[in-house]
Amino acid sequence: MSVSKASRTQHSLVPLATLIGRELRSEKVEKPFVKYGQAALAKKGEDYFLIKTDCERVPGDPSSAFSVFGIFDGHNGNSAAIYTKEHLLENVVSAIPQGASRDEWLQALPRALVAGFVKTDIEFQQKGETSGTTVTFVIIDGWTITVASVGDSRCILDTQGGVVSLLTVDHRLEENVEERERITASGGEVGRLNVFGGNEVGPLRCWPGGLCLSRSIGDTDVGEFIVPIPHVKQVKLPDAGGRLIIASDGIWDILSSDVAAKACRGLSADLAAKLVVKEALRTKGLKDDTTCVVVDIVPSGHLSLAPAPMKKQNPFTSFLSRKNHMDTNNKNGNKLSAVGVVEELFEEGSAVLADRLGKDLLSNTETGLLKCAVCQIDESPSEDLSSNGGSIISSASKRWEGPFLCTICKKKKDAMEGKRPSKGSVTT
C-alpha cells in the first residue's frame, strides 16, 4: 500500500469547505500571526531559502494575504536551486483559476503545486544545465498549511502537547521502498556505488546518474524517472497554533524530528532556528550545507507559541497552575476551536501525473482552445503541437486519461513513466 493510500486509510479527511463553513458559522476567528526565523551555515554553498510574507491571492487586497516559505538544497551546482527559488511560486499561482474564492483557491492548491513543480522542472531543463535541487515549499493561508516536497528537505509540525507530525515524505532511495520499486519499474537501476574489487559502498543510488534521491527538480543528465512530482499535504491547525521546522538534510542527517522540536520549544522562532543549527553543528560538526527556517503560526494577541519547559513545582503551586490554565481555557472556549487537534485536509504522493492532475479538460470558452494543465498555454487539440512532428497521443504509450497536455508536457509525462530512454552520468 502506498504512503498516501495508507494515510488516507488511517485518517478521516475533512472537506475543506466544511472547515471554512464551520469558521463562518462560529464567532469570527482572527487570522493568526506568522512569525519566522532563519539560520544557515554553508559548506558547499548550494542551500537556498525563500521567505515571502506579503503574498496576496487578490492583488491589492490585504485580507487575502498568504505566506510562503521554501528550502532548496542543490546538488551538482546551485543553478537549479536558484532558478526554482525565483520561479516556482509564480508557476504555482498561475495554475490556479483566476477569480477563485478562498475556498476554491485552497482546494485548487494541491493540483497547482504539482503543475508548478513540473513546469519549473521543464523550464530549467530546457536551459541545458545539469544541477538539481530538493524542494520543500510551504504555503500558509490563515490556519491552513499546504506543503509540497521533492527530495529530503523535511518539514515537521510541532503543536501544543508536544505532538510532532511529519508533513513531508523523504524521497531517499535508502529509506523509501516504494520509490525504489517505481524507479526499477520505469527502467532505472538501484544499487550502491561499486569501488575497486567489486565492493559496494555508500547509500543506495539510482542509475544512470547515481543520485541518492528519487525526486527532484533539474538533474537533466540523470534518468527521467527522477521526477519533479511532489508529495503534497494540506492540514488545518487548531486555533492554538503550531510551529513548523523546515530544514535541509544538513539538519535531518544529524537530528531526529523529535529532538529538533524539543530542543527549541519555548524560544522565539528566530532563536529556535539558530539553536537547531547550533545543535546540529555541536553534534557532528559542519558536514553539509545546513539551513533551517522556523515558522510560528500564533493566535492573534499572543506574543509567542510554545511555553518553555515546565519547572518542578510543589503540589500546591502545581494545583494553582492547573486551575489558572483551566480558567483561561474556559474563558477563551468560545473563541478557540473546539477541536484542539490538527485536521488533515489532503495528502497525495503518487508519482503518476494522471493521479495528480485529474481528468478534466481545461478549456478557454472564448476561443475554444484547450489549456495545458501543466504549463497553462492555450493550444488547439486538433493541431500537431510538437516541433518535431509528433502527435498529441504518443504511439509509445497508452491513451492519456488525464487533462489536456501540450506536446512538450506530454513528452515529459511519457519520459517520467519510463517510455523514453534517458542517459546520464551525474553523481552526488
From Swiss-Prot:
Gene3D superfamilies: PPM-type phosphatase domain. PROSITE patterns: PPM_2. It catalyses: O-phospho-L-seryl-[protein] + H2O = L-seryl-[protein] + phosphate; O-phospho-L-threonyl-[protein] + H2O = L-threonyl-[protein] + phosphate. InterPro entries: PP2C, PPM-type-like_dom_sf, PPM-type_phosphatase-like_dom. Mn(2+) 1 binds at residues 73-74. Keywords: Hydrolase, Magnesium, Manganese, Metal-binding, Protein phosphatase. Its cofactor is Mg(2+); Mn(2+). GO terms for cellular component: plasma membrane. Residues 25-297 form the PPM-type phosphatase domain. It comes from the Eukaryota. GO terms for molecular function: metal ion binding; protein serine/threonine phosphatase activity. Binds 2 magnesium or manganese ions per subunit. Mn(2+) 2 binds at residues 73, 249, 288. It is an enzyme of class 3 (hydrolase). It holds the Pfam family PP2C. Its EC number is 3.1.3.16. SMART domains: PP2C_SIG, PP2Cc. Disulfide bonds: none annotated. SUPFAM superfamilies: PP2C-like. Belongs to the PP2C family. This is Probable protein phosphatase 2C 5. It comes from Arabidopsis thaliana (Mouse-ear cress).
